[in-house]
A protein has these predicted regions:
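Short coil/turn connectors at secondary-structure junctions
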Residues: 18-22, 60, 84-87, 180
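Conserved active-site and cofactor/substrate-binding residues in soluble primary-metabolism enzymes
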Residues: 1, 42-46, 50, 71, ...
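Glycine-rich, charged/polar anion/phosphate-binding loops
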Residues: 6-12, 74-77
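Structural signal for hydrophobic packing residues in well-ordered secondary-structure cores
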Residues: 51-59, 84, 88, 132-136, ...
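Glycine-rich phosphate-binding loop
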Residues: 71-108
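C-terminal binding/interaction regions
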Residues: 39, 108-191
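Active-site rim loops that border cofactor/substrate pockets in soluble metabolic enzymes
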Residues: 48-81
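Glycine-rich phosphate/diphosphate-binding loop of Rossmann-like nucleotide-binding domains
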Residues: 9-59
Length: 191
């Protein structure tokens, strides 16, 4: 099977953005590091590509920061939003749970929340990027349409709990966010 691989390079301390036309993407400790795909098997490389494409389509710049001090989505997203020049950020956990946050909102609030990661598609991630970019431009986009499956929670709860435990094991207490640059590669075919 072939697929995309994703690594992050050039880790440097994340600094507050100076551009008012940027969206930060905050990734969790294990994203494209300990884990390489979401709970349903979407590659992290494809997820990041789609989010960045959605941002780029709106002609807004993007940066990515890794938040190592927490595996809580609200903390990841709000930390990134506080560093974003526009005040808008996307938080992204390894299992695929996503949130669009704004710097001046309380940490546990958000502009848009996508809690059912098993229902996220690559198209949804692209729309998340697009909406975040529209918020960064001062627009009020229609919320990204989401699916709702009452059985998703019981069906995926055990796996989600295990993934969260593994993600939490990757936390580095007191670590400051670092800015990272994505590097994409094509995986080799295996038999």
């Amino acid at each position: 099977m072939t697929g995309r691989l994703l690594t992050f390079a050039d880790e440097k301390p994340a600094e507050p953005g100076k551009r008012t036309d940027e969206v930060l993407v905050g990734i969790s400790p294990a994203f494209a590091d300990f884990f390489s795909q979401t709970i349903t098997g979407l590659s992290h490389a494809d997820v990041i590509r789609q989010i960045l494409a959605g941002i780029e389509e709106q002609e807004v710049s993007a940066r990515i920061v890794r938040v190592r001090h927490s595996s809580d989505l609200a903390v990841v997203a709000h930390t990134a939003a506080k560093l974003s020049g526009s005040g808008i950020a996307i938080g992204l956990l390894s299992r695929g749970t996503t949130m669009i946050h704004q710097r001046d909102l309380p940490r546990l609030s958000s502009l848009e929340l996508f809690p059912q990661s098993p229902l996220m598609t690559l198209e949804t991630y692209r729309q998340v990027g697009s909406n975040a970019a529209q918020y960064a431009k001062g627009e009020s986009p229609e919320p990204v349409p989401t699916l709702n499956d009452q059985m998703a929670r019981p069906r995926w709860q055990a796996k989600a709990a295990l993934l969260h435990l593994k993600e939490t094991e990757q936390i580095v207490q007191g670590a400051k966010p670092v800015e990272v640059i994505p590097q994409f590669a094509q995986a080799l075919a295996t038999n």
